[in-house]
Amino acid sequence: AGAPTDKDAYKNRILYHFDDAQIVEIADKRVGLFKAFYQADLNQWYLAQIQILPEYQSHKIGWALITELITKATDNNESVALSVLKGSPARRLYERLGFQCVSESELEFNMLFHSVDRE
């Protein structure tokens, strides 16, 4: 199972909170996209999208970006939420970083990092 792959679904994923997107660069080369935004009503950050080029995925870039977000959240007693597709190997990374599955849909696991869990 995976996310819808039609052109409109792909475009919607890219445009969702597009203003919050950051291009990830290593040595002046664009290697990925990182998109997270703060949800004040929930006192949490939402990690909406992280994409790293395949040839850079073993360089711990995603780990570093997520760790930086977790540190920012922890410093302010905030949580971090995300959704991950079922079957995605990224779920193991999120679990190693302290995220826990709090619910699921047909396609995704919804995960949450509580800053108090790390204290």
Tell where the protein language model's regions lie, with residue ranges.
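Conserved beta-strand in the GNAT
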Residues: I23, K29-Y38, Q44-Y46, Q51
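Conserved GNAT acetyl-CoA-binding A-motif
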Residues: A73-L85
